[in-house]
Regions:
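Short intrinsically disordered terminal tails
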Residues: 1, 64-65
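DNA major-groove recognition helix of helix-turn-helix/homeodomain DNA-binding modules
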Residues: 42-57
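DNA major-groove recognition helix of helix-turn-helix
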Residues: 8, 33, 51, 59-62
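A short, Lys/Arg-rich alpha-helix, primarily the initiator
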Residues: 1-14
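Short alpha-helical DNA-recognition segment
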Residues: 12-31
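Alpha-helical residues within the helix-turn-helix
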Residues: 9, 20, 49
Length: 65
């Protein structure tokens, strides 16, 4: 599971913008956001760089259980 959706929502960024920056289709990015598929590590690292967050923020919840 990843937290791409939460980070996008927090930053007010649209999936279409992220897809364009990644050079991937909206459908691919939507699959990542909806957790239907997981990005490869290098793609996850690229997403983190584009969103200006630590890659850990995309995979580890900051909420305490």
């Amino acid at each position: 599971m990843n937290r791409i959706k939460e980070v996008l929502d927090k930053k007010g960024i649209k999936q279409t913008w992220l897809a364009a920056k990644l050079g991937k289709s909206y459908n691919i990015v939507n699959g990542y956001v909806q957790n239907r598929q997981q990005p490869r590590l290098e793609v996850l690292d690229n997403i983190a760089r584009i969103l200006d967050v630590d890659v850990v923020e995309l995979i580890v919840s900051s909420k305490k259980k």
